[in-house]
């Protein structure tokens, strides 16, 4: 998603007892800029400028007073420039400004949860598309689910200015409590370690579905994140909720360690590659054809399959080139990838089409599964389709394809109801 150029740097701009947070400027919307000066007396003095003053001015003032009281701030001069921020954003910006002013909050002032936690996604759920949303730009959050990506990524890493990361962390935390992202899997890309450990403390208790770990080069880095999650969840309401991991491999060393990384934690559901950083690490430009990264991309697929996790491709950065995106997506699927990232909503439909199984493949898979079911019903160990014997790996691949087709509405749910994976002793004699 494109970021606005007009912004004020947030947490980090603080003088003695003065802190600011948020973003302001003519191009800014759905956000709030706050400057807070802590005082020893005098109560709360508010100076509010809001584009929605006529409708929500009083409500904003009331919320500001309530949040400050909850944080234990009783004496402060507060200046606010509001561009239509929602309550969860107002709370996050106020808390960030209080922290930037050097005031330690006296209590938990998180907003009440207004978005119900969706059912936890299965480890192997469909992940064709994942839409990146800059974590410090809440204007993108509200409508993101309407575009129906398989996943949304609240990004705390590359899309967020270093000085704004503490403030963005609070916005993302609150979004997980207050924004309905529809059917999308709710992912958070943390910062690379060690800063990412601070991100985990903020977001893990809110029940995200997946954590993306950037710039992973060793299995130990994954294990460090895994152990941190265990500690955070120990006394959390989200302790019984599965939390999946997706390491991002962005260097030559990361690719060389792909299999070890993919096996580093039972929480890992997928691994992916970051092509911009990978190409930079090689010292070569990233090209549309991708010849410079073809080996690494195939190496990652092989490692993922060997570890029984999903292989997810990188983003296609040319937002306006939808034909190029389609070609890239089709090649990606042909390499064994199960999805890819996207940086703009217009890419989602093209990606879904690129990763849609062709009708001929679905038809063949249905026939293979039907032949397997018939062989099992007749007590035969050999699966055949016509005069051709079908090996167990082929049946398993067909079952996976049928399940995917059903999820997409491309195959009837009543066709070949029992598609349980093959046991090791069932199947063709051809390879024995």
Predicted features and spans:
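N-terminal intrinsically disordered, cationic/polar leader segments
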Residues: 1-122, 431-432
């Amino acid at each position: 998603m494109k970021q606005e150029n007009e912004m004020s740097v947030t947490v980090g701009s603080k003088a003695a007892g003065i802190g600011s947070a948020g973003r302001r400027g003519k191009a800014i919307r759905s956000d709030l800029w706050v400057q807070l000066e802590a005082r020893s007396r005098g109560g709360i003095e508010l100076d509010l400028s809001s584009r929605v003053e006529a409708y929500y001015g009083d409500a904003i003032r009331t919320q500001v007073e309530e949040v400050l009281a909850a944080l234990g701030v009783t004496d402060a001069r507060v200046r606010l420039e509001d561009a239509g921020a929602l309550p969860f954003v107002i709370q996050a910006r106020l808390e960030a400004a209080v922290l930037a002013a050097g005031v330690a909050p006296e209590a938990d002032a998180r907003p009440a949860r207004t978005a119900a936690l969706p059912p936890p996604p299965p480890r192997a759920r469909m992940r064709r598309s994942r839409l990146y949303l800059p974590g410090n730009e809440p204007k993108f959050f509200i409508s993101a689910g309407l575009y129906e990506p398989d996943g949304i990524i609240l990004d705390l890493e590359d899309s967020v200015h270093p000085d704004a990361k503490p403030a963005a962390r609070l916005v993302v935390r609150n979004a997980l409590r207050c924004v309905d992202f529809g059917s999308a899997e709710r992912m958070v890309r943390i910062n690379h370690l060690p800063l990412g450990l601070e991100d985990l403390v903020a977001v893990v208790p809110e029940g995200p579905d997946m954590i993306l770990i950037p710039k992973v080069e060793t299995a130990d880095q994954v294990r460090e994140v895994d152990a941190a999650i265990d500690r955070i969840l120990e006394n959390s309401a989200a302790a019984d909720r599965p939390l999946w991991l997706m390491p991002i491999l962005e260097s030559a060393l990361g690719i060389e360690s792909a299999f070890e990384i993919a096996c580093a934690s039972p929480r890992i559901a997928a691994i992916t590659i970051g092509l911009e950083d990978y190409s930079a690490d090689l010292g070569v430009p990233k090209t549309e054809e991708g010849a410079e990264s073809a080996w690494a991309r195939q190496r990652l697929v092989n490692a993922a399959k060997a570890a029984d996790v999903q292989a997810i491709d990188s983003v296609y950065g040319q937002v306006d080139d939808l034909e190029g995106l389609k070609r890239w997506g089709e090649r990606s699927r042909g390499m064994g990838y199960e999805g890819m990232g996207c940086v703009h909503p217009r890419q989602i439909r093209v990606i879904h089409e690129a990763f849609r199984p062709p009708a001929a493949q679905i038809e063949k898979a249905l026939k293979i599964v039907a032949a397997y079911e018939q062989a099992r019903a007749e007590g035969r160990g050999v699966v055949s389709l016509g005069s051709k014997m079908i090996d167990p790996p082929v049946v398993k691949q067909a079952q996976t394809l049928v399940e995917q087709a059903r999820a997409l509405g491309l195959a009837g749910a009543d066709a070949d109801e029992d598609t349980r994976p093959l046991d090791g002793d069932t199947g063709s004699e051809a390879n024995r």
